[in-house]
Amino acid sequence: MLEGGNEEISTIPGFNQIQFEGFCRFIDQGLTEELYKFPKIEDTDQEIEFQLFVETYQLVEPLIKERDAVYESLTYSSELYVSAGLIWKTSRDMQEQTIFIGNIPLMNSLGTSIVNGIYRIVINQILQSPGIYYRSELDHNGISVYTGTIISDWGGRLELEIDRKARIWARVSRKQKISILVLLSAMGLNLREILENVCYPEIFLSFLKDKEKKKIKSKENAILEFYQQFACVGGDPVFSESLCKELQKKFFQQRCELGRIGRRNMNRRLNLDIPQNTTFLLPRDILAAADHLIGMKFGMGILDDMNHLKNKRIRSVADLLQDQFGLALVRLENMVRGTMCGAIRHKLIPTPQNLVTSTTLTTTYESFFGLHPLSQVLDRTNPLTQIVHGRKASYLGPGGLTGRTASFRIRDIHPSHYGRICPIDTSEGINVGLIGSLAIHARIGHWGSLESPFYEISERSKKVRMLYLSPSIDEYYMVAAGNSLALNRGSQEEQVVPARYRQEFLTIEWEQVHLRSIFPFQYFSIGASLIPFIEHNDANRALMSSNMQRQAVPLSRSEKCIVGTGLECQVALDSGVPTIAEHQGKIIYTDTEKIILSGNRDTLSIPLVIYQRSNKNTCMHQKPQVSRGKCIKKGQILADGAATVGGELALGKNVLVAYMPWEGYNSEDAVLINERLVYEDIYTSFHIRKYEIHTHVTSHGPERITNEIPHLEAHLLRNLDKNGIVMLGSWVETGDILVGKLTPQMAKESSYAPEDRLLRAILGIQISISKETCLKLPIGGRGRVIDVRWIQKKGGSSYNPETIRVYISQKREIKVGDKVAGRHGNKGIVSKILPRQDMPYLQDGRPVDMVFNPLGVPSRMNVGQIFECSLGLAGGLLDRHYRIAPFDERYEQEASRKLVFSELYEASKQTANPWVFEPEYPGKSRIFDGRTGDPFEQPVIIGKPYILKLIHQVDDKIHGRCSGHYALVTQQPLRGRAKQGGQRVGEMEVWALEGFGVAHILQEMLTYKSDHIRARQEVLGTTMVGGPIPKPEDAPESFRLLVRELRSLALELNHFLVSEKNFQINRKDV
């Protein structure tokens, strides 16, 4: 619990709460809503009727545990049973049975689902809310054109447009538009009813000409005219029932279904009182919308801001799962209808169980979790990543925007995001501003809006009430800005305070304030809230930092940060990584695999996670933190997980850093590090890789797993057991065989030995040979085998292949090429590992651990790292930890600097080291060159910031190519490490080489090493035997390709070779 401004206390909501609430809403409401929509199904003769009895549906507890589902690659789901009845109308008999409809994947305690053994998460989508929106645009003459856009629940649009002559049109597509009178007549109104129900009948009459009167003479004429314009049909179509059905399906169903939220928005915007259960667009809505549009034309009314959050709705996990359930029931209905007709045709007696199959629902959900863009594999790099992933809000996805077409205005920060969507945390690149992160206190309301909490300020009552307000409500209140949190009640009443009102910032007296913020972190996401001194950083660097914290690798020895923000504990607890006691008791046994807890007359065995692989190959491992015989309370930490210490998030290490140049080794964001970080395993992490192989039944027989592999060296097979699978605990190197496998294949007739041909001719014996298809360890995969899983197929089906998975653990120390970063967007690549005796050292003899470039601070404006650096030094010397809320300047001016200097001064006094705080240059110190022992000319900032090691590691990226595959068309090497590709020499690289005058290297890169087919073959031979490299005389393949392309355009192109001896031009065809 964290204190607000005065005596009130506010709790931070659970970070997974949005996912839990969404799933519970689906189970409690969504399921029954969709089941009630399931219709009664009759056969063609209307003799039998099938129906579901929704009241008695039940979800069964899963048969397997979460851990087993992950281990065996199964889905953690619940079976759904519903009562169904089959009624014979002639005899009025009814047969009722409880039928199994299918499996619904359940949500676990992390807010994720396990589908086929993979953790998947459904992220929230931000969509335009259904309803009507008015806006104006300038036409080519510079005149404002006013439009009203009706957006349906399906995302379809119907635009009403008023032109210069005050005529109102309904635009059914980008090119086609019809008169609004035709649309209203097609919906069933006559001219008298239209004119009686509008505010401006004279405007409607003004564009009613003879031609229009003919079109709206009858409903049939209007429907025909509307159909002609909508479907772009020529000629004279004839009115029919099928034409009406097509129009209903293609237009009215897609563009006029408002839904529950759309009806509410329509009623509010147009001041209507149509019942909430009327979710279809009525003629009355269009008449009211047209009246409003005419008012807009003549300067009455307010245009809508399409980017305001009150005009958006959140499509949560509940809505997406409900949509999929409805889709599955539609498919089930069609299947039941077909099965029923088939049974009657073949004179069989159907039963409810025979009519319903469970595959429809199960496959619908499996395809949704596997293929839908909003269902993503849970990023499990570290505990912070797991939490943040479920709190994303995306404008992308079905019915949303695309990264290439979204405008800058949509991506930009909007005042209505305050306290709802974080203004900092978003993805970098093409999706910037389109994928955001929810603020800490934000929640999704009943109507799909994002709500933020505020304290209500009341003069009558001294008690402060907390309200959750939607974006459409809070802009009508005076909301005091965050710095009012610091003022006590006595001084508040005397001062004027900054406040927000209708997206503007004002300065008003305290008595006029209606609401105030509840918490300093209220505006930020979790990632941004973990950055200390964030108010001293440029927003772009804070964005990079909140993204890079999610890329931090869990280290083998984690360490708490000296300077933090106070949210580290909650992030760790909500991530589910540490093990927490569910009730009090006494520890009676503990080891690395389990903790046994005794309490309340029962004994509970708590299994621990041991060397488990995350999907980013990081190591998830739990270490017990309690000893045998200790009494514990409910909620106490039993075991720490990856990147947590004492139940707090611990992503990096506090290391001694100096900001100074060092022989150019730290220029341009390079980082110089001490060898101590390698030898003492400061930045050592474990990574677990998974390698798998399948065995299939081929047309020539089944594949075999064996250790008897012909034509392979015994050294490569040394780690295999008698079954042909690598032994647990083996150390394996690149190229070693992990699983021995032989695939049978038929030999060609010519390759048979004479005796084999004789046997085949006499006895008809098919002689087969086997091909070696073993699982080999690829480059960079060396390590220790920690687990082998042989997943056997069930039922002996050839379609379910056996799978063998081998897990190999690697220990990775920090090395040159690894990426490290601070928490302020200060990132760099390790450029050199220096012996500790050569590193710069402090006045007490300690060598520094890292040397950063001081030029990386001023231009990037992330000064927060300097505050953290100096405060970390003081905390390290005083053995203190600091937890600092952002925007501490609200208490007094220069609050951050005063805190840092006072702590440095105290550290200087307590340790009797005057160099820690020198008044001439506070925060800086004279340090010495480790190579010469001389002091550097200028004092240097030294400190202990929190530095992370990121997942971008050189072991995963370093790559070299000798020879490999070539592209078929250009004959140039492929691209990328995975394809054993080459390095592209582009236009600018060629310029650089030209600038240095390296003609021979340039020629080799563009010919021998690239796409000159004959020359590259000759080079290989001369390299093997020695001798001069032959010079190519013909053109490389890319030039020949250009010539072929020009010939396809009927342009003949030849090139000429100039001989060096006589300079005569010899013509040569390409």
Swiss-Prot record:
Gene3D superfamilies found in the cross-reference section: 2.40.50.100, 2.40.50.150, 3.90.1100.10, DNA-directed RNA polymerase, beta subunit, external 1 domain, DNA-directed RNA polymerase, subunit 2, domain 6, RNA polymerase alpha subunit dimerisation domain, RNA polymerase Rpb2, domain 2
One GO cellular component term? chloroplast
Q: Does the keyword Plastid apply?
A: yes
Keywords assigned by UniProt, alphabetized: Chloroplast, DNA-directed RNA polymerase, Nucleotidyltransferase, Plastid, Transcription, Transferase
Subcellular localization, per the record? Answer: Plastid, Chloroplast
Which EC numbers characterise this protein's activity in its record? 2.7.7.6
One GO biological-process annotation of the entry reads: DNA-templated transcription
Q: Where are the transmembrane segments?
A: none
Recorded GO MF terms? DNA binding; DNA-directed RNA polymerase activity; ribonucleoside binding
Taking the first listed entry, what is the main subcellular location of this protein, grouped into a coarse class?
A: plastid
Instruction: Write down the InterPro entries for this protein, in alphabetical order.
Output: DNA-dir_RNA_pol_bsu_ext_1_sf, DNA-dir_RNA_pol_su2, DNA-dir_RNAP_su2_dom, DNA-dir_RNAP_su2_hyb_sf, RNA_pol_bsu_bac, RNA_pol_bsu_CS, RNA_pol_Rpb2_2, RNA_pol_Rpb2_2_sf
- List the catalytic activities from the record: RNA(n) + a ribonucleoside 5'-triphosphate = RNA(n+1) + diphosphate
- Main function: DNA-dependent RNA polymerase catalyzes the transcription of DNA into RNA using the four ribonucleoside triphosphates as substrates.
Report quaternary structure and partners. Answer: In plastids the minimal PEP RNA polymerase catalytic core is composed of four subunits: alpha, beta, beta', and beta''. When a (nuclear-encoded) sigma factor is associated with the core the holoenzyme is formed, which can initiate transcription.
Its family remark reads: Belongs to the RNA polymerase beta chain family.
Q: NCBIfam families recorded for this chain?
A: PRK00405.1
| Protein name from the UniProt record | DNA-directed RNA polymerase subunit beta
> Where does this protein come from, organism-wise?
Morus indica (Mulberry)
Gene behind this protein: rpoB
